[in-house]
Amino acid sequence: MTPWFLYLIRTADNKLYTGITTDVERRYQQHQSGKGAKALRGKGELTLAFSAPVGDRSLALRAEYRVKQLTKRQKERLVAESAGFAELLSSLQTPEIKSD
């Protein structure tokens, strides 16, 4: 099974783009060359701010969704403190208990 990664790319205007891939370097190069996500085209210099393995595609999609819901401040904390990402990942792997 090919592992999936979650990554954050910082744009020249300091915004953070979140994505998932099985090959971070390849995907980053696609974004750099303008062949990646339209959201990053024409955004100036791009920097890979964060990447981490998340497991399978299903978990990667859930992690991407959760990170995209975070505020800019929370995303910056995630980039600065990888422990925060471990907590996020752990919460996605734990089944939620629904109460009626």
Curated annotation (Swiss-Prot):
Gene that encodes the chain: yhbQ
Xref: InterPro entries: GIY-YIG_endonuc, GIY-YIG_endonuc_sf, UPF0213_domain, UPF0213_GIY-YIG_endonuc
CDD domains per record: GIY-YIG_UPF0213
HAMAP family per the UniProt record, alphabetical: UPF0213 (MF_01029)
Family of this protein: Belongs to the UPF0213 family.
Stored SMART domains: GIYc
Pfam families noted in UniProt: GIY-YIG (PF01541)
Protein name: UPF0213 protein YhbQ
Superkingdom classification of source: Bacteria
Residues annotated as domain GIY-YIG: 2-77
UniProt cross-references to SUPFAM superfamilies, sorted A to Z: GIY-YIG endonuclease
